[in-house]
Amino acid sequence: MGLYKLYRSIYIDSDEESLSAIKDFEMLEGYDPYTRDRIEEIIELNRIIELDDDDVIYDQIYFPYNPLHQVIEARRANLVEIILDQGKYTVNSVNDDFIFYPLHVLTCVPETSDVLTYLNEIEEFTLVKDLELRACKMNLSKSISIAIIKQVLKGIREFTDNDLRKLDNQIREDELKIAQLLISRGAKLDIKNEYGYTPLRNTVINGNFALTKLLLDNGADASIKCNGMTIFEISTLSQNVDMIKEIIKRCGYNHDSKILCRVASKGYINVIHFLLDIGFNVNSFDSFGETPLHAATRSGSVETVNALISYGSTVDIKDNIGSTPLMHACGNKDISKLLIEKGADPNISNIHGYTPLHNAAAYGSVDVVNLLLSYGVSIDAKDKIIGSTPLDHGVHHPEIVKLLLEKGANPNTINLYGYTPLKNAILKSRLSAEYIIPYVVLQDFSILDGRNMPGSGINMELIRNDKLLQNIKTSCEIELKRMKEIRISNRYSLDIFITTSNIKFLSRLVTNDKFSSINISSFPIYKSLLQNAINSAIELRKCLDVALYTINSRLENTLWDMLPIEIKNQIVLLLDNTDLSIISNSIQHSQN
């Protein structure tokens, strides 16, 4: 009987079968439950086991190789009592390597993936995690994961909400029974494991209200700090407001500025509401100058961010380096959008000159980059460290490079080290470098003195020294030459649509009948730029035509009628997007 077979038996088999498995295991020659001999099997996995929450990942391998610890982990209350009655183990039998006592095992919740790995059932991970998520949304205990695993291993794959509630009630009953048994036989309540954690700390952070009350009622010392945190601070990480209230009733609470920040970073919105309602400062800050709003942006929870703002959190408050919550949120579009809608400045920079766009580009967040650009942020803003632009920061994300260039980013900027975005891209992402070449060539083609620009010169030298990049450059030049040869008016060729950003000007050219005969797909390198420019020009042309029609209708039989159509068109071109929107809305209003 190997160690893993025993572990599996305890999770799957009947009491009688598991007891037989334990007996067979203990009969192995040289077995000593208080040595590490058997753990050699476990070390081969070389895994890190997370026992309870995201804040605490044990940096060594833990496995309940003591049979008493195994039956406690599996919450086998009957087996715990039988094994203790046999006298081979005591309520204070300890795993010497981790100083894990039975109460530590009971008050921790093992990581699902590790349990399934030991059971050789990792293929059930998705099913079990989905069920755990359902249980979490139902506010059931974390320990239900153990009950779920045992049921799934028995072949049960469908669970109603009522089934999950029954499992939760049973696991809670088993835990209380085991705890009462251990305590009644003299288990040490305040013993610390290798990391300084007590059983009380574990029950509190895991939100196990019943076990917490039991330990406190039996004299567990609530004044012991773990990692410098009071039991109240630990309770705020449990997500269980009833737990927090119980701790406050018994032990009081402190107003450490880090508490609300820590909770906000987890997105525990119910705890946030409770803490703010009892007087915590929504604009408190930690040693880094971060407020709860800064921390909440990392939680991924829009609801948490919105709640803090509703309590009066300052949206553009700065931390010690001048970064605002928006700068921390640049990997999440929904949170970034909410902050801007609530008044956050998308163009703000910190003491290093980083803007939200720098951060969004570095994160590789296409959605946030698009969002920020829609608010007119400076696309070529340089930081104060080495003069890098958002394009420089995004070179390791090809999709970001492509987007920024399409939106007008300058590929010929130079930082303080003499690096251009192309040089950075060659070092970090070959695909990004290939995306940059067409824009370097286009800028060189568009600006008469482009060859005298320092950045252009550096980029052209880089291209000359790379055969593949040189081939891309040649293909770009061929396309541009062909566009130059396609006349769309007496003065302009097709290339004007990618060499100017003046959409109003292009809207005057796009009405030319020659466009219907142009095959945009024959320009694969610049197709996207061409198509976007043409579409934007067509859309604006439609808006201008509607505006002109509306003005003609409203000013009929006035001096306006005497103006030549050319003058009218020039006047309409002076209207900005706001004016055009007002006119469009007035039409819709009159139609309604």
UniProtKB/Swiss-Prot annotation:
PROSITE patterns: ANK_REP_REGION, ANK_REPEAT. ANK repeats lie at residues 63-93, 162-191, 195-224, 227-255, 256-284, 288-317, 321-348, 352-381, 386-413, 417-449. Keywords: ANK repeat, Repeat. The keyword Repeat applies. This is Putative ankyrin repeat protein FPV246. SUPFAM superfamilies: Ankyrin repeat.
